[in-house]
Amino acid sequence: MARTAPAASFESLESDLDQKFAYPASSKTYLTGSRPDIRVPLRTILQTSTRTEKGEMPNPPIPVYDTSGPYSDPDVHIDLKAGLPPVRAKWIEERGDTEVLPGLSSEYGRDRANDPATAHLRFAQLTNPRRAKAGANVSQMHYARKGIITPEMEYVALRESLNLQALYDKPEYKALLRQHPGNALGAGLPLRPEDITPEFVRQEIASGRAIIPANINHTELEPMAIGRNFRVKINGNLGNSAVTSSLAEEVEKMVWSIRWGADTIMDLSTGKHIHETREWILRNSPVPIGTVPIYQALDKTGGIAEDLTWEMFRDTLIEQAEQGVDYFTIHAGVLLRYVPLTADRVTGIVSRGGSIMAKWCLAHHKENFLYTHFDEICEIMKAYDVSFSLGDGLRPGCIADSNDDAQFGELRTLGELTAKAWKHDVQVMIEGPGHVPLQRIQANMDEELKHCYEAPFYTLGPLVTDIAPGYDHITSGIGAANIGWMGTAMLCYVTPKEHLGLPDKEDVREGIITYKIAAHAADLAKGWPGAQLRDNALSKARFEFRWEDQFNLGLDPERARSYHDATLPAEGAKIAHFCSMCGPKFCSMKITQEVRDYAASLPKEAQQGMEEKSIEFLKKGSKIYS
């Protein structure tokens, strides 16, 4: 039964925002699973041939993980007003443990649906939400613990492996698949691509070491995994505020984020029309969407933290769960007894959610209602398969405050809540700092693994120094690469505007690319199977002066091309054996190639003579003067 509403009248949405895009020299391909509707996307980067004196030698295509959804598929028509295809709808329906509700369960959701003042903002193609049948649990963890491999788990296995095992027997990939041994620091990574099986995924989900955030009402989702024994993922933030940003901008920013590689998106909206903004984003997002429900609950009180109630928060959880939010940041570890521990901090409590709950606790002199009602929250989560992202409301806001009693006290409470959530078979990840100098990062990872039982860690950086406003994507990227290697499963990006203002599209791009670098560096360090393939391909292209391949194999082809063309814009420069840094006379790679070519061109007799002289020199004790 569908609910209809007038389409949004934003001019940019009416013109479809033109969100389709194509990556250079790339094709969109799909891996098919055990059933035809398990179609896992990947991007294949095509390479040009290597020119040699003997002719052209072809270079093979390079498969890469793809987060862009249908937006980069030339065969799919995108209509933002209709939303994306419901990839998971059939899987969910076949399981037979959910039911379509006759209407919305949330009081606030019903009010918004019937409010004529918001009709022009509303997403038009809404369907009634699903919920677990009475007594049922529909979480991926519940299925995994029952020994069931879901289509979502099979999808993840194919997505993580990229079917790289098929390349190992092909001679054209032999050199490209060489990889330095990693140091997984105790993690149980698969050793080879063929080890990334649906059963491996099931075991990781069942143990709680990984999650598949996949609300049953987010059928447009392309399933992915967050866990220490998978590829390191990154999250991008968006959201309107009371100061700036519009609904259309946020939809555009979501598509822009996944274009550059965001694995998940958090909608942190705090301004007008939070409900409508989230609906548009969800219906058009192929990646998991997370929120901080306390932000919207606070908005319902007019911004007065003391007026928050459990009933109001509960209604907000149900409202967002029925829209399809995949994971909730919930600051249930901010306990009354921890708040005084922040009094001597340099920057106090910097988490918005943490400060809201701290203020509520102090105003009422009661324990955090998110903590006291945690079991009831779990009942909601497992009815829709919403994952917990247990918030670090007492994270340090500067390196001076790192690793203090407030931070680690809350972390231990998050471990207690993790165990409680797992009794309900609810999926959990743990949020982490923040601002931590390099020498104190390892302690954060050790504490999380010990007290939170290896639940996936999800960190904001951390920023390793506080002296670089405007460059905090770099200060945090350094920490992110390190903690990613140590075991963090997902890295929350930081943009250059951190601490300064709301990021625009270019800031988002800069933050995502920075964090893609950090995540990939962590994968290399851990020894993720096949992680070095793209590095090797780009290095080979660089040595052979295949400029277009260098651009296209990079994380940001547009930026690389523009930097090259700033000094050598002519098309002929794209095949030149030098760049503007060294010029044609001093290029080390060009000189090395000339030396190789010279050695290869010498007659066999000359080579043999040089080898004989070399042996003679060694027999004489390698002395220059005798």
Curated annotation (Swiss-Prot):
Pathway(s): Cofactor biosynthesis; thiamine diphosphate biosynthesis
Keywords: 4Fe-4S, Iron, Iron-sulfur, Lyase, Metal-binding, S-adenosyl-L-methionine, Thiamine biosynthesis, Zinc
Molecular function via GO: 4 iron, 4 sulfur cluster binding; carbon-carbon lyase activity; zinc ion binding
Catalytic activity: 5-amino-1-(5-phospho-beta-D-ribosyl)imidazole + S-adenosyl-L-methionine = 4-amino-2-methyl-5-(phosphooxymethyl)pyrimidine + CO + 5'-deoxyadenosine + formate + L-methionine + 3 H(+)
Residues noted as binding Zn(2+) in the record, renumbered to the chain: H435, H499
UniProt binding sites for [4Fe-4S] cluster: C579, C582, C587
Required cofactor names: [4Fe-4S] cluster
Short name of any one Pfam family annotated for the protein: ThiC-associated
Xref: InterPro entries: ThiC, ThiC-associated_dom, ThiC/Bza_core_dom, ThiC/BzaA/B
EC number assigned by the record: 4.1.99.17
UniProt keyword annotation of DNA damage present: no
Highest taxon of source: Bacteria
One GO CC term on file: cytosol
GO terms for biological process, alphabetical: thiamine biosynthetic process; thiamine diphosphate biosynthetic process
Co-factor binding comment: Binds 1 [4Fe-4S] cluster per subunit. The cluster is coordinated with 3 cysteines and an exchangeable S-adenosyl-L-methionine.
Entry function: Catalyzes the synthesis of the hydroxymethylpyrimidine phosphate (HMP-P) moiety of thiamine from aminoimidazole ribotide (AIR) in a radical S-adenosyl-L-methionine (SAM)-dependent reaction.
Complex formation: Homodimer.
Similarity-based family: Belongs to the ThiC family.
Name the UniProt record assigns to this protein: Phosphomethylpyrimidine synthase
Organism encoding this protein: Cupriavidus taiwanensis (strain DSM 17343 / BCRC 17206 / CCUG 44338 / CIP 107171 / LMG 19424 / R1) (Ralstonia taiwanensis (strain LMG 19424))
Lineage, opening ranks: Bacteria, Pseudomonadati, Pseudomonadota, Betaproteobacteria, Burkholderiales
